[in-house]
Amino acid sequence: MAKRPNILKLATKISLESMTYMGITYDDPEYKILEPIIDDDMCAIMMHVRLETNRTVEEVAKRARKSVEFTQEQLDKLCKTGAVRYRYVDGKRCYFYPIWVPGIMEGILANREQCDKYPVLGESFEAYTRRRPEMLAPMLDSGKTGMFFMRVMPVMSAIENDSHAASYDEVRTLIENATAISVGPCSCRRARRLMGEGCGHLEEDMCMYLNDNARCFSEQGYHRLVTKEEAYEILQRAEDNGLVHEINQTPGFEDTNAICNCCGCSCFALRIAELFRTPRAIRSNYIARVDKEKCVACGQCVENCQTNALKLGQKRCTTDPHISDTYDTDASVPFHRSSYNPEYRTNRSDVMPSGTAPCKAECPAHIPVQGYIKLASLGRYTEALELIKKENPFPAVCGRICNKRCEDACTRGSIDDPIAIDDIKKFIAEKDLEAGTRFVPKMLNQIGRPYTEKIAVIGAGPAGLSCAYYLAVKGYPVTVFEKESVPGGMLTLGIPSFRLEKNVVNAEIDVLKELGVEFRFGVEVGKNMTLDALRADGYKAIYLAVGASKGTPAGCPGDDLKGVFTGVEFLRAVNLGKRPTIGKQVAVIGGGNVAIDVARAAVRRGADVTLLYRRGREEMPAAGEEVAEAEAEGVKFRFLCAPVEILGEKGKATAIKVETMTLGEPDEKGRRKPVGTGEFETLAVSAVISAIGQQIDLCGIDAGSKLRLGKRGTVLVDPATYQTDEPDVFAGGDLVTGPKFAIDAIAAGKEAAVSIHRFVHPGQSQLIGRDHRDYKSLDPATVAVPIESFDNTPRQHAHDGSAEEAKKTFHDLRGVFTEEQMKKETERCLGCGAVVLNEDQCIGCGICTTKCKFDAIRLEKVNDTHGREYFRTLLTVAGNTPAAIGRLVRKTRGR
């Protein structure tokens, strides 16, 4: 492309007038952002427009020595590009241009059509805001607050009762004094999208212009005018989404012309705090303060902190002198590039190196256990349910079937018994079983209206339902395709009702229906519908969650005889109300939870059940309490024996031959390998049920696709995003991991929803700005519990039906805590986690205060400065003389 000296001259003129001239070449962003959009005639006219100086068309025409008609035509085109603006003075348009940033470049990025045509515009905006502010960074870190051209404003709710708050601390002042307000795209997010580096926060309807700016950009068609009431709604929606309010303070506070709603993962102004580590440059007059005693480490403030100034840590004292939950920050350390954080968009962490509450860290879904326990203790049950559902849409289901890794890791368990976390959750989730009391979340997204991109979910098991739930909450139209006649997958067809009543599953699925999720049953994608057919029907992304719903045969001679079932096959029949013929003498093969479920279900069908397991009792993967329940109901166990052959007469199973085993050397998983002894025994049976594993049946979904399969038939995906080799196809749950627990599938479904949201909006990265949810538990052995305040209350137990009663019914006879029991159990929680604040990194936005339900974090006013006009700011940070700016430029270049 030919170099254009006239455009270089124009860029130089703007920079000189802005006092930011550092020498401009054809490779610099100031040139590259103007070159594609300004032709020679436009350039000739713009040379006679001046920085922040009002000139009518007649004045510009006179200076350019062109006709008024020609000049007006070029000015109109320049305004359309966003490079030139106008304001009305005495009813007449007066033309000017602002500084580069915030100013010209944001204006250029407001024009979507030209941006999509010339992606270099976004690249230039990014480059300028990265390279040019760097020369000011050393001065901006001098301890002065809010000295940069953009400045954070605290959320109104955080300071509304603060007697020290001034009018220039309140964004309300700007809204109320505005003569016009418009809303339009976020230029930073648009630039990121053009570069393929979007963070998942979308650009539309987020940033507001005020007064003359609002009139100019709405008349150009890039913004839309809004009322003050609508402006407050936009601000509230931004806060709900965790976005920070910032203002352009270059005209001075009273004449502020823009309010941005920013995220730390895309905003070029917040980058000052994160990349250069100079948060004071943009900080409001406030800073956050954490009340550690009130904090319950729910993590809501951490996840929404745009500068990663908050992390989860420990509340209790530690016996290890090497553990410290504090930040080592020193403002006196000289500023240097070595202190930059160039990977800030991908390296944020949620947890201090010493770890945090194990209940949250070890849960696959990272549910804020400590938080909902505290809410329950206060009787705030709906809020507790809401908090749980931020990570798990099925608390009533999981309160009955979860494998309770939170309890296994509970710090209290290192003292006596762990907190009965699942029973507390089960008590809270009783509200979900009734339509009048269940919690149905409101749609939450940036645009305040549903998205139009249709999403298909294949499989109505826990992974598919979780993905559908979180996509629906975000406002997407979701259709779930299920080959069975009922939803729930293994929750409905693979777990017997005495462990999970179907009305519980259906009640929580009803929430999805209220959210607008559509279900289509009897549709087997891969057989009567293909992936291409879904695409042709307008689905922009597909989530595969068909699970591992096929049983594994016994794998020995005779496993094809009548009366031989797989565990999955048997449980499916039972859950559909059928009565498979099993007779009175049933052998169940396996040692996992499915084998226990099968054995207990067979007992309820009147059978005498013997469970055969090739290892010892200690090696059984089944939950200990379920093994005990099975024993109490009459299931007999034969350990260290493996099936060799199923014998039969007239095509029907009548006996099973087993070999006595011994345990040899550990296998690749560390489990001692069973080795045959050569001793055999034959047991009479009327049926054999093999519950030794589950298999994946894709039903031909992968035919003709780029899907890659693993050794066990699992679908291979990116481990962080769940994206397959078909870019619009994502997968999760047992289909990816092989058989695991419901909570694992639920967690995977939520992560896939994050990925799908990013995928259906072109230009969004799957990894940039993503919370990688890398949690670490504190070491319970180092927690110091004060004996004088230790609550010795024993663990509470719900009243369950007796084993004799239980084995006669398929109803779940396990009890639910009384409210008194629940309150006693919540008091046993040690509350070992708390948030840790890095005050030096805090920007005083107050978003954290809007997320905390425990009054554990607030804003405190620590400064009393307000916005100052651009040139005063520039001179102040540079040393109060134009010559100092030159010295600063030379110093910056030399570093």
Provide a role label for each language-model segment.
Residues 92-131, 879:
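Short, amphipathic alpha-helical interaction segments positioned at domain boundaries
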Residues 367-377, 418-422, 457-525, 552-555, ...:
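Beta1-alpha1 glycine-rich phosphate/pyrophosphate-binding loop at the start
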Residues 307-358, 373, 416-421, 425-454, ...:
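Flanking helices and flexible, charged tails adjoining ferredoxin-like Fe-S electron-transfer domains
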Residues 79-90, 310-311, 857:
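A short, conserved structural fragment
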Residues 560-585, 666-739:
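FAD-site-proximal beta/loop scaffold in flavoenzymes
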Residues 428-449, 507-527, 551-605, 709-725:
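Glycine-rich dinucleotide-binding loop and its adjacent helix/turn
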